[in-house]
């Protein structure tokens, strides 16, 4: 790679979702939940086929692409997921608090307890704090906060 380029990185996740979940009511629930809990916003799908729900997660190049599928949609074992990194444990807790508030009005929301572990990368130890949230799509979302351990 040239010095001015950056390593390839993930910029979106595309998931085929049961079309029954993606009807008008379901799309509204998905948009409301992911907007309220994560702050994601709906993107323009006017040039896309199949009427996907596009949720921008931060910038134009970072999004979740949910495509309605009648026959062949994603089915996953429990806890298959994708992860998002948060800036602090406090931010993670704020997201979890919003998810718990939403869960009170919609019991389909699932949330795991917050966990923590030590992990190693390039001869350094890090503290990884995480929790998982699920709502209507086949994959859970893992929230992660990683910080360098200074107590070792």
Give the residues covered by each predicted segment:
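Vicinal oxygen chelate
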Residues: 1-23, 74-152
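Core segments of cupin and vicinal oxygen chelate
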Residues: 15-63
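Short, well-ordered turn and helix-capping elements at secondary-structure junctions
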Residues: 17-19, 68-70, 118
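Generic "edge-of-domain/loop-turn" microfeature
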Residues: 20-22, 60, 71-73, 89-91, ...
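Short acidic, gly/pro-rich beta-turn/loop elements at beta-sheet edges
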Residues: 23-25, 65, 92-94, 143, ...
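Intrinsically disordered, low-complexity segments enriched in polar/charged residues with Gly/Pro
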Residues: 39-43, 71, 117-121
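A short, hydrophobic/aromatic-rich structural module that often spans a beta strand
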Residues: 43, 49-87, 91
